[in-house]
């Protein structure tokens, strides 16, 4: 299914869920891909329901430059021990990282730098609660209903303390898709 077809379906079915759109460029097509995504999102007026991320920093920077109000993130792959401190200077709204790479120390460092962390792909309640306890701001899951219930229960007894400066839009704690 194409992005365009998915958005049409979501609008038609009045689906009250946001999209995390991951750009996966190949062979230097990142800029072109980013512009095409921008065009589709604008054509269907879907920016308020969308956030964007990529392993390719240049691709998300195209979106950030063209649409600074849109929420964009950088996807970390690999060991957090291999990440240098320049990551905290990136022009991004959040970081997404693979669940088996997350550590309390890294998440707390992100909190100190006021960078929300989203963890993928978390598909069981115990792990969801564990990552929320560690201080993550969002969960990326293949089971949105389970994720939503877990987050709602968690928020009843825990203060949501991560920084949100009002720029961009989502105060997102759950993202669907894996």
List PLM regions with ranges:
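Metal-dependent phosphodiesterase/phospholipase catalytic core, i.e.
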Residues: 1-71, 77, 90-93, 97, ...
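C-terminal active-site rim and adjoining tail of enzyme catalytic domains
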Residues: 73-178
